From Swiss-Prot:
Residues 48-76 have a biased composition (Basic and acidic residues). Residues 1-187 are annotated as: Disordered. Residues 29-47 have a biased composition (Polar residues). This is UPF0688 protein C1orf174 homolog. It comes from the Eukaryota. The keyword Transmembrane helix does not apply. It is found in: Nucleus. The lineage of its organism: Eukaryota, Metazoa, Chordata, Craniata, Vertebrata. GO terms for cellular component: nucleus. Residues 11-28 have a biased composition (Low complexity). Belongs to the UPF0688 family.
Length: 237
């Protein structure tokens, strides 16, 4: 009886140990499963957190770039009006220099010709204040070679008369001015006989018969007429 009880006790203790081991293994498996589930849940949350951080950084970088560009544009726009007055300074200095040169040229001229002359002379003297004394201007087209007239001004009428009286273009022999059908002018000869200049250069034609007077020509004409009448009468008879 005692041996059976001991055997039953040993068996019961072994069973308890096996149960405790199985429970421990089950609890270990449960803890492992829970830890794996927690890690699995934590990984997407960490990914989401990193994605949010990157998106925030990207948005911040974008906003920073846009702000920097706007600041650059503002600085450029603020710098441009400050540069514009500087561009007018050389023009103003050039105008001042031209006025000073004009004053110096006016002061160097004699007192007799200090005032501007009427007409075109005043404009010409004002337009050329920067002319040097050593370099004279070239003569203008149509101006007289002898110099200036009427107190230093080139005479327009004299130049026009010189142009009119001077050797003009050679006259054309085609008579293009006389081609109007409604006009009473005669037709040009060159339209029918070619170049008239070649015809004028030809020597005169020598007459084979000797020159006769007007009376002799009339006598011959009447004689020929009488002969024709006699021939006509003879033919009728």
């Amino acid at each position: 009886m005692r041996s059976r009880k001991l055997a039953g006790g040993v068996r019961s203790s072994a069973r308890l140990r096996a149960r405790s081991c199985s429970a421990a293994s089950a609890s270990a498996q449960d803890t492992h499963v829970t830890t794996s589930a927690q890690t699995a849940c934590q990984t997407p949350s960490s990914h989401k957190a990193t994605d949010r951080r990157t998106s925030k950084k990207f948005k911040y970088d974008k906003g920073h770039i846009v702000k920097s560009e706007l600041q650059k544009h503002r600085s450029d726009s603020a710098a441009t009006p400050s540069e514009t007055p500087g561009t007018h300074e050389p023009l103003a200095s050039a105008e001042d220099g031209a006025s000073l040169l004009g004053k110096e040229a006016g002061g160097s001229t004699p007192q007799g010709t200090a005032g501007p002359l009427p007409g075109r002379c005043g404009t010409e003297s004002d337009a050329s204040p920067a002319e040097t004394e050593n370099e004279p201007l070239p003569p203008r087209h149509g101006a007289p070679v002898g110099g200036e007239s009427n107190g230093g001004c080139p005479a327009r009428d004299g130049a026009a008369l010189d142009l009119e009286q001077g050797p003009g273009a050679p006259l054309l022999m085609d008579g293009s001015a006389l081609l109007d059908d409604d006009s009473n002018q005669p037709m040009p000869v060159s339209r029918f006989f070619g170049n008239v200049e070649l015809m004028q250069d030809l020597p005169p034609v020598s007459s084979s018969c000797p020159s006769m007077s007007r009376r002799e020509f009339r006598k011959m004409h009447f004689r020929a007429k009488d002969d024709e009448e006699d021939d006509a009468d003879g033919a009728e008879t």
